[in-house]
Amino acid sequence: STQGVSSAASDVYKRQYLARLKYNYDDRYFLEGSFRRDGSSRFHKDNRWGNFYSVGASWNMKQESFLQDVDWLDALKLRASYGEVGNNMGVSLYGHMALYTIDKNGGEAALVKQSLSAPDIKWETTQTVDIAVEGRLFNRLNFQIGYFDKRSKDLLFEVRLPLSAGSYPWVADTAPMNLTQYKNIGTVSNRGWEISLNADIINNNDWKWNFGVDATFLKNKIVKLPDGKDILHGMQNYSEGHSIYEWYTYHFEGVDQMTGTSLYTLDPDKKATAEEAGALATINGTDYATATSYAKRDWAGSALPTVYGSISSALSWRNWDLNMLFTYSLGGKTYDGSYASLMGVSESGASGNAYHKDILNSWKEIPTGMTETSANRINPNGTPRADFHKSSDLNAASDRWLTSSSYLVFKNLNLSYSLPKSWLKNIGLEGLSLTAGVENLFTLTSRKGLNPQYSFNGGSDDTYVTARVYNFGLTVKF
């Protein structure tokens, strides 16, 4: 057989200079600052270097004289910081240069431009503000409450230009590809609150029980876009003031119980063309589209949860220890494309097709007593008829397939037993313990089989729920 031989070489470098200063006064006041200068050959020589700094301060309030005699307060600290970090990974090794590909022109070898030069691109910068208070109360309760604002600006993207800027052949006998160019576009903000509580509920000689919970509330917002113009991308519409995780899609009104047809909110500007195409339905004085080509897109919620976090428990009795960990997420929507693909009727292949059992709920006939003017003619939770020829319209991408992303996962259960040291003295061992545990004991979601943990942007992509793992262990100390 013929074997291929290839080689590659690249000329790229990154340099960093770092300075840091720390100051501590009387274990009460702490100050830290840093400055770094980063250089990368990925950028043009005029924009090669970026300067980034950070500063942080904390105040150990418990050390102050006015708090030292407060018995129920064991610790209290206030801290705040601001920092900048540069990123150059959004651009290729030679992204600021015009790149060429080898092709042919009239049967002769030729170099064809593939991307335009980008001498003006610069470092992408992430600026983070963090403010928090933490402490311990009654020698039992630890707490931490923090606010953060992480803002990324001058985001680096490879932008595909219009054909008027030029093109190049991608594959023979196919349409040409647009030229690309790297650009700094947009500013995105991620801000929110982090809360953590941890309590020693029981703490005596035999019994000890620690219980903890933490929660993160996150808001994402697009602060700035090039020229303030929206960017429509699939089922998202990147728009200033909105989140990059917000869904922007067609609204599924329900199923017409007289015909079994899916109904969508009509775009008023497309009413005439919808009527000409036979895709307009008027029910009780309201117009609907029966195909998304004539429907109106609108905001349909976010893939981001309202709150997410974990719950932990550590219980011990003499030589026994039982530890549990749960993770949770509340709010947010997942586009269940896997479920959608199992609900659409298509031509069967040699081995047939797979369908979800819910397809058995498809509309089959006009319900008894239903008329053209019935107030409940539209079933908002209905399943349209199974129709091979109209499946693409009946089961089109819309908010019908958005489902709750909320979940609760029993992440870890671990039981261990340590043999008494008095039993081990005669055999020369310092310690011996046995452990048994289960990971991913169960997952609770809105739809069986859905794995909303898979993706933060709300996709599903036929991913399995995380596998359950059993483990056993033996620890020996000599």
Task: Indicate where each model-derived feature is located.
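Short, flexible active-site loops
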Residues: Y294-A295, V307-Y308, W320, D393-D399
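Conserved small-residue
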Residues: D200-A303, T334, M343-I378
